[in-house]
Amino acid sequence: MADPLYSSLKTVNSTSKVTPESLVFQTKILTPEEAKNVINEKIAFKPLLLVPSLNLEKQGDRKESVASKKRKKLSSKEKKKLQLNVVPKIADYSQFKHLHSMWCSYILEVIAGCTGESLMAKLAKAEYQGAYMQVLRSKSTTRVGLEGICIHESKHMLSLITKENRVVRVPKQDSVMKVIVDVPQRKLVFELYTQHLLLRAGDRSNKRFKSKNTIDL
């Protein structure tokens, strides 16, 4: 049996649904009493389902735009294209002195209060870009004695800028480096077996290190 409240409404398509919006529109042709009954029984105190805004954007384009907003870091391909990891052969040593002073402050905070194995673990996970290093021992005798500020560290190589404004590359494998922390309060010197650091600095910070035998060079 048809609802008497809808007897005065205009005929609509059988496929169309009656929505609160259509009811409000149709109440314009009802008597005030009929309109009041429709509103009280069909609309009042009921959740109003809002009609979503019309979006003609394709789903694929929407996913790409969302992905582009989420991605903030450069990919490896983009870094290579921009040559961000390319180390110049010649650079100005004086430009990296401030980097070294910042690194000295950083390493003092890292090793503060550490002794024994905890100190070794901290040094193994530390960042060495900015450290002043000297090659103590190496299988390549031509590299022994090279020293400078580390300006780039990769998985297998250390790049040092010497006081002669020359950039030299030292392999981590089969090398022993002397790291110097020279600050007004004190001067720290320690040996670093870089063959145990064959990881990128970012990956090394999350790795759990275990003591390993060191091959004498």
From Swiss-Prot:
One of its GO terms (cellular component) is ribonuclease P complex. Its EC number is 3.1.26.5. It comes from the Eukaryota. Its main location: nucleus. Part of ribonuclease P, a protein complex that generates mature tRNA molecules by cleaving their 5'-ends. Belongs to the eukaryotic/archaeal RNase P protein component 1 family. One of its GO terms (biological process) is tRNA 5'-leader removal. InterPro entries: RNase_P/MRP_Rpp29-subunit (IPR016848), RNase_P/MRP_Rpp29_sf (IPR036980), Rof/RNase_P-like (IPR023534), Rpp29/RNP1 (IPR002730). It is found in: Nucleus, Nucleolus. It comes from Schizosaccharomyces pombe (strain 972 / ATCC 24843) (Fission yeast). The keyword tRNA processing applies. Keywords: Hydrolase, Nucleus, tRNA processing. It catalyses: Endonucleolytic cleavage of RNA, removing 5'-extranucleotides from tRNA precursor. This is Probable ribonuclease P protein subunit 1. SUPFAM superfamilies: Rof/RNase P subunit-like. GO terms for molecular function: ribonuclease P activity; ribonuclease P RNA binding.
